[in-house]
Amino acid sequence: MNFKIGVTCALDAPAGSPFPLVNPNVYETVDFLAENGFDSMELHLLKPSEVDGPKIKEYCQKKGILISSIGTGMAYGKEGLSITSPLKETREKAIQRLKDQLDLASQLECSIVIGSMRGEIPVGRSREEVDHLMIEGCKELAEYASKGKGWIVIEAIDRFETNYLQRAEEVLEVIDRVGSDRLAVHLDTYHMNMEEQDWKKPVLLCGNRLKHVHVADNNRNYPGWGLIDFKPFLEALEEIGYDQTLTLECYPRPDGKTSVLRGLEYLRKLIAT
């Protein structure tokens, strides 16, 4: 096995967020990752204007760090933006924000994550209504992405955080209905532990449409500080030829830097066996 390993990072984040590295100076974060043997970073931004795309790309290249993806969920948490909102104005703002993120992703040649920005199925609305808005929104975004070098990954998220798109097969159904190769699946072991029945089957089902992975233990601490046996999952990734990053998205326990260093050590040992 030979996988790249990265970390979810943010310039700012609410207390309790599973972002182990939070620093308003993104260049210091890149330095830490490079100095400690990481391969990549996932950068969470409220707005893409918070960073200078060409400058951060050049700095990361100089340090040997890949930017794997841009996290977008802060726009949902702080501003309530989702592409399935009952309010047309909110949907339009969400789509525009994601297009702006895709502009940055095109500069960085990476993906954007649609996690919480997909929204939920609210009381009084049907799954079909929400599916329609999700598919129409993703069609527009996929067409926009096709003009640049960025792409979109949709994350399967557990039932305690959303009631919509919780398993790999549900995300794949949306992708199939959109019909664009600019859309792919994003799996997270923390969410999979609650929603999937097997570690291998969802990965094999996704195949080459799996383009992003988060790793955390069942308690959302770093891998190795919980109950998950990661070996079958990693074997399945190897079987499908997964060539993207394993990104640590875990709580900063006992602190951010310690958590990711321990997670890195655990994964490197596991991959080597």
Where are these regions (language model features)?
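Short helix-capping segments at alpha-helix termini
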Residues: 62-65, 144-150, 176-182, 239-242, ...
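Active-site acidic/histidine proton-transfer and metal-coordination neighborhood
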Residues: 25, 81-184
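Active-site beta-loop-alpha junctions enriched in small/polar residues
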Residues: 10-14, 44-46, 72-75, 117-119, ...
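Gly/Pro-rich active-site loop or hairpin
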Residues: 11-23, 82-89, 125, 164-165, ...
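Hydrophobic faces of well-ordered beta-strands that scaffold small-molecule active sites
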Residues: 3-9, 41-43, 67-72, 112-114, ...
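Generic structural signal for well-ordered alpha-helices
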Residues: 29-31, 53-57, 98-102, 135-142, ...
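N-terminal pre-domain/capping segments
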Residues: 1-106, 180, 265-273
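A structural motif
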Residues: 35-38, 105, 109-111, 210, ...
